[in-house]
Structures are given as structure tokens and as C-alpha cells.
A protein has these predicted regions:
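Well-ordered beta-strand positions in beta-sheet-rich domains
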Residues: 50, 85-87, 101-103
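Short acidic-glycine-tyrosine-enriched beta hairpin
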Residues: 82-98
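Ligand-binding loop in jelly-roll beta-barrel domains
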Residues: 98-126
Length: 129
């Protein structure tokens, strides 16, 4: 399969909102287009990211870290190896365990919060399928 990242993928791992700062999700949603991934804040040893999805992301995995997806706007499907795809609608979440191949897909623009270990590689650190 040897998939590549979407041509318009942009990842900003710089923390935008430090502690004791209001995180303005509506402003972030206005300011970004798909496929944008913004690190919002750090909580202990985890990062909270906002992703704007539209279309298919490549299959990938995070060898040593779990990844939590929570839909704020729109709807996504998570293809996960060795199980049926999981459809997530607004205010639904799902955790993909470490070392499991997965890919998010969204037929239309969707906004997703992700909670991941600090230092995770958002595009995956395992081989793409």
C-alpha cells in the first residue's frame, strides 16, 4: 500500500496554549483547513491536539503510545487493523492501543481532539502499510 501523507497536511507541534490560558477551540476551527494538526496544550505527560480532517489519512501506528480520538464537529471513521471500522460522531471517542495500525477517514471537514503521549509522532512511528 505504501501510502503518503495528504499533500495539504500541516502539523504544528508547538504548544499554542500554556497552563492557565483559555483554549479557544472556535477560533482554532475558523483559522485552519484540513489536514491541520495543532498541539493545543500539555497535561502532565500528554498532549492535547486539535485535528481538522477531510479525506483519508494513511495507515500508520504508534509503536509505544495509545491514541485517543474525540469528535467535536463532523464525523470520522477509524479503520483499525483486525476489526471493523469504528464510526465516531460528535461527542464520541475511541482509543487506539499502541502498536495497532489505524487510519482516520472523514468524508467531510471534521474537527477532532486527540490525546496522546508527549513526544508522539503524529504521523506514526511504525511502518506504513
Amino acid at each position: 500500500m505504501n501510502e503518503t501523507l495528504p499533500a495539504n497536511f500541516h502539523n504544528n507541534e508547538d504548544v499554542k496554549y500554556g497552563q492557565l490560558r483559555l483554549v479557544d477551540i472556535p477560533a482554532e476551527l475558523r483559522d485552519h483547513v484540513p489536514w491541520f494538526n495543532q498541539t493545543l496544550t500539555i497535561v502532565n505527560d500528554a498532549v492535547v491536539r486539535l485535528g481538522i480532517f477531510e479525506g483519508d489519512f494513511p495507515w500508520h501506528k504508534h509503536v509505544d503510545q495509545d491514541e485517543f480520538f474525540f469528535v467535536l464537529e463532523g464525523e470520522i471513521e477509524l479503520d483499525v487493523e483486525n476489526r471493523e471500522a469504528v464510526r465516531l460522531r460528535v461527542h464520541e471517542g475511541f482509543t487506539v492501543p499502541k502498536n495497532v495500525m489505524h487510519r482516520p477517514r472523514s468524508p467531510k471537514r471534521s474537527a477532532v481532539l486527540m490525546v496522546e503521549s508527549l513526544g508522539i509522532v503524529p504521523t506514526g512511528d511504525g511502518p506504513m502499510a
